[in-house]
A protein has these predicted regions:
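Residue-level signal for mature regions of secreted extracellular proteins and peptides
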Residues: 13-14
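Alpha-carbonic anhydrase
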Residues: 21-257
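Bacterial N-terminal signal peptides that target proteins for export
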Residues: 1-8
């Protein structure tokens, strides 16, 4: 009889500990921000990077009214190289293209891809996401630059003219680049769309880089307009970089507007 009582007490203690552990996780993470309940658990190891991490699940029904955020693009159709970095496909910009936000000018540096998307919208994942990365000037190695990243989501659909311009230029070998002739890849074929130039057509929030060192000095602008790319185009990029999306992170006290 004593063995039975001991076993019951041990079982109850185990259940209590499990319940407490689960409650701690729920206290830290809003599981509803994850597409799947277990996805929230991936956030735990990243807490050491801070509470303003990216990407996030953007809940459109909780979006605040825009408070006047506006970005101004001043870009040139000057992409100097296409790189196969192994973990992503990257296009490098020549100097001279900028984006301005709240009086700060950021220099276009590069754009790259994630398959599938890193950001979610109302729990929905998209097959691909493009990031256009801009930074403030690097003053010295001890200064952390500020970043402005434009996120563009893609769904499967018609062939994308901009992607077609460089897909065949991507080097086969990892960690190599291919120079781009002037005018061969036209950024205007991507950014001149009416939808992308509507200042009300994006989600904004403060966050981080989605790759090491996960720096938390990023102004994120994720466009609401979902662009199209053919399944073959998306598969071609995924075949090079694989599945390279970071798990979504807790939003904590931040808001999306």
């Amino acid at each position: 009889m004593s063995k039975i009582i001991t076993s019951v007490l041990f079982l109850c203690s185990s259940l209590l500990l499990t319940s407490c552990a689960n409650q701690q996780i729920k206290d830290i993470i809003d599981i509803s921000d994850s597409p799947h309940k277990e996805a929230g658990l991936y956030i735990q190891p990243e807490l050491g990077h801070g509470h303003m991490q990216s990407p996030i699940n953007i809940r459109s029904f909780k979006e605040r009214a825009s408070n006047g955020h506006q970005i101004t693009l001043n870009y040139k159709d000057e992409i100097k190289a296409v790189e196969n970095l192994g973990h992503t496909v990257q296009l490098d910009f020549k100097a001279g293209s900028t984006v301005s936000y709240e009086g700060i000018k950021y220099d276009f540096k590069q754009m790259h891809f994630h398959t599938p998307s890193e950001h979610l919208v109302d729990g929905m994942t998209f097959p691909m996401e493009m990031h256009i990365v801009s930074t403030t000037p690097f003053k010295d190695k001890n200064t952390t630059p500020s970043y402005l990243v434009i996120g563009i989501l893609f769904k499967e659909g018609k062939n994308n003219k901009f992607l077609d311009e460089f897909l065949n230029m991507i080097p086969k070998a990892e960690h190599t680049l291919a120079p781009v002739e002037v005018g061969a890849v036209k950024l205007g074929d991507l950014l001149d769309s009416k939808e992308l130039n509507d200042v009300k057509n994006f989600y904004h929030y403060p966050g981080s880089l989605t790759t090491p060192p996960y720096t938390q000095t990023v102004q994120w602008f994720v466009f609401k307009y979902i662009m199209e790319a053919s399944p073959e185009q998306i598969e071609a990029i995924n075949a090079i970089e694989g599945n390279n999306a970071r798990h979504i992170q807790g939003i904590f006290a931040r808001s999306v507007d």
